[in-house]
């Protein structure tokens, strides 16, 4: 008798994706982050659902409803902090996942990579709108500053901003629509993640060497299911350490003050995972230029396959490219630090230099290093 998992129409899909899937036999722990992102997404949808049961998206009661969740709802505080810090864990996994793709040349799977970039944009939009919902000072001023960037678009900018606001300032209409979008986007992300997996399973996974691995495959279950469970346990451990011991470590104290349109927050800054892009935005004195640099800082990922000049796919055997990659990582950490600092000397010049370095490393030095390595191979 044939096993039900191989005959049942639904079970067959699950079987081919998670059980009998042929996987390369040498993929390292850097390949764990895909499954960890899936776990984060499920966790965020579940905690978000329970928060939405008690949250009210009205400017007069939003802040109070979040306080009510933390004080009066059974285990509301843990649900709230799991959701807030879950977003941080989500982005840590995401940055690791993208970094792995860049290092090992996974961007040569064009469809998978491009869907991944769309997923990144969708996640950034979701996180931004979620940050507005508690209606604290940083929520309000963050929403005002970031939505205002659209006014840099020539001719239609001002109308576009007022259309998004639903009025002449960030107000009740803005909060209500942000809540609606924040609720629907994770389900769109789930659908996109399924398409991401669909395209990945058309080609099969990459591996650390970047070499075609059809001649050496192993079943996904039990080898990689066990490996994924270990990763999941470590993720949950890290998340719960954050939630139970330092829930406000990554948050902003200003967001514990209710939103006040008459009083500007002293240092307007987004959550830590957007600081690198925020630093690039601030480093250009021109508004439109800053917005373009901000968008390009993420869109640069789409250009990666076109900028790949090496004869080898992975960076595993390319020491010059490895050096440039790790300098890029250090540069991104520098930008993250600068994004959280006030706009004054010496932070302004450091931010500008780090922004120039970011684009220089990605667009110029990376392809140059690959070409040099190609020539060294001939010796």
Swiss-Prot record:
GO terms for biological process: mitochondrial electron transport, ubiquinol to cytochrome c. Keywords: Electron transport, Heme, Iron, Membrane, Metal-binding, Mitochondrion, Mitochondrion inner membrane, Respiratory chain, Transmembrane, Transmembrane helix, Transport, Ubiquinone. It is found in: Mitochondrion inner membrane. The keyword Disulfide bond does not apply. The cytochrome bc1 complex contains 11 subunits: 3 respiratory subunits (MT-CYB, CYC1 and UQCRFS1), 2 core proteins (UQCRC1 and UQCRC2) and 6 low-molecular weight proteins (UQCRH/QCR6, UQCRB/QCR7, UQCRQ/QCR8, UQCR10/QCR9, UQCR11/QCR10 and a cleavage product of UQCRFS1). This cytochrome bc1 complex then forms a dimer. Heme 1 (or BL or b562) is low-potential and absorbs at about 562 nm, and heme 2 (or BH or b566) is high-potential and absorbs at about 566 nm. This is Cytochrome b. The gene is MT-CYB.
């Amino acid at each position: 008798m044939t096993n039900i998992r191989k005959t049942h129409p639904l079970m067959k899909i699950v079987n081919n994706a998670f059980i009998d899937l042929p996987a390369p036999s040498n993929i390292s722990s850097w390949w764990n982050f895909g499954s960890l992102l899936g776990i984060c997404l499920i966790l965020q949808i579940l905690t978000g659902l329970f928060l939405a049961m008690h949250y009210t998206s009205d400017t007069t009661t939003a802040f109070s409803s979040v306080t009510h969740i933390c004080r009066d709802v059974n285990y509301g505080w843990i649900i709230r902090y799991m959701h807030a810090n879950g977003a941080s864990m989500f982005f840590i996994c995401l940055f690791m996942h993208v970094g792995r793709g860049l290092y090992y040349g996974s961007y040569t799977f064009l469809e998978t990579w491009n869907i991944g970039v769309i997923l990144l944009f969708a996640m950034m939009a979701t996180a931004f709108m979620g940050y507005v919902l508690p209606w604290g000072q940083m929520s309000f001023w963050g929403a005002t500053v970031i939505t205002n960037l659209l006014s840099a678009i020539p001719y239609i900018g001002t109308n576009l901003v007022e259309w998004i606001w639903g009025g002449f300032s960030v107000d009740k209409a803005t909060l209500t629509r942000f809540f609606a979008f924040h609720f629907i986007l994770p389900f769109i992300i789930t659908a996109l993640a399924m398409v991401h997996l669909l395209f990945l399973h058309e080609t099969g996974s990459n591996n650390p060497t970047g070499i075609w691995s059809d001649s050496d495959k192993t079943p996904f279950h039990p080898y990689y299911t066990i490996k994924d469970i270990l990763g999941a346990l470590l993720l949950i451990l890290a998340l719960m350490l954050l939630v139970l011991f330092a829930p406000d470590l990554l948050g902003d104290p200003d967001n514990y003050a209710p939103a006040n349109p008459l009083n500007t927050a002293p240092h307007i800054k987004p959550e830590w995972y957007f600081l690198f892009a925020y630093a690039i935005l601030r480093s250009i004195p021109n508004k439109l230029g800053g917005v373009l640099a901000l968008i390009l800082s993420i869109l640069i990922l789409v250009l990666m396959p076109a900028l790949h000049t090496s004869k080898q796919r992975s960076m595993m055997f390319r020491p010059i490219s490895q050096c440039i990659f790790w300098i890029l990582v250090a540069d991104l950490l520098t930008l993250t630090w600068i994004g959280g600092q006030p706009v004054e000397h010496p932070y302004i010049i450091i931010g500008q230099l780090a922004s120039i370095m970011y684009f220089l490393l990605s667009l110029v030095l990376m392809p140059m290093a690959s070409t040099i390595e190609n020539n060294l191979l001939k010796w």
